Amino acid sequence: TKVWRDHFKDGDLQASVRDSLNRLKTDYVDLLLLHWPVPEVPLIETMQAMNAVVDSGQVKHIGVSNFTVDLMDEARAHSKAPLAVNQVEYHPFLDQSAVLNACRSAGMAMTAYSPIGQGKVFEDDVIKQIASKHGVSPAQIALRWLVDQDSVVAIPRSSSEAHIESNFKISEIKLSEEDTGRIDALRSPKGRLIDPDWAPDWDK
């Protein structure tokens, strides 16, 4: 579960966790993420609150979402508990090399949300060609490309049983080095699709 931006203060964060546990009818959650960085609240205060809910047994693991490399480093420096993950936008059109390398160095996973680029994979000629060659969908190619990368986890939306089954079938796809290289070449720092007003100063 995630802590939204308006609950990053000490006390507010713990209350948010209690509310989540009550809604989920459980005593603890396996993973708690900070949804977006909030410059108005000192990160040390937020991380101390995150550690408090770990110490209380309400949360097993903590992580962040939409954090830049510098913010990841700051969060780790202020946390006794290790950070498990940084959940960020990642798909074949966005270069997230800086964050991914930082996650690997820190022993963290990088979870890719919006892994099919809000449907852009269905319009891209390179991905469509590779999908046709393998006899699968462009979405399956994008997911295979993501999970082939060390430390990357993809979280596709699954609105139907057919989508869930399709996602599982990516284990049967084997991308060649040429396939991977062609998809790698699509990545760009300018490929970001999700950039709200409160977003941080992204890594270049």
Q: Which residue ranges define each predicted feature?
A:
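Beta/alpha (TIM)-barrel catalytic core signal, keyed to glycine-rich beta->alpha loops juxtaposed to Asp/Glu
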Residues: 5, 37-204
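Active-site mouth loops of central-metabolism enzymes
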Residues: 1-11
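Ser/Thr-centric signal marking residues that sit
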Residues: 1, 26, 46
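Acidic active-site catalytic centers that drive phospho-/nucleotidyl reactions
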Residues: 2, 30, 63
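CE4/NodB-like, metal-dependent polysaccharide N-deacetylase domain
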Residues: 13-33, 52-56, 78, 108
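Short, conserved acidic/polar surface loops in the N-terminal third of protein domains
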Residues: 9-14, 43-45
